[in-house]
Amino acid sequence: LLISAFTGQIQAARILIRDQATSSLMITPTAVATWDVSLTALETRDPRDIAEARAANVAAAPLSPGLSVHAIMILGALEEVDTAYSIINGLLLRRGGLVTQVDSGQGPSPASDPLWRQTQWLFTPATRSLRADPRFLSLSKDIGLAEFWRGRGVPPDEGLPRG
């Protein structure tokens, strides 16, 4: 789904989401509806469609870490950087008005656990606009990536000043 959605293969993504909606317990009706409007926005780039996708993703993001990550990637691909950072702050830093629910009754999600943050999606083509934003440096510091890079003696990933 993600590869199709973010490489312009919108019809393939629509087929995948429809298949998942009927055959998977992992995708919720909220996710299906959010992806539907988001795929339209990714395809048309029409400001009205983007506004609808932004609203759907903002509504869905606080419901689960998975919906938050998808919202961030979608909004990054749509270059809705401010909204994406609002969701990032809620998911990874537990700050702001869009804090993601992380306890589903099965214990807290690892998505926002400082000991095991899942952040690979920050380094996908869909989130390039987020890495280009000046806030990426402070985010990298706040979630421990900058310290990780420094401690390992490796250069920072894309979007950070080197040295």
Predicted regions and their residues:
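Alpha-helical protein-protein interaction modules
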Residues: 1-163
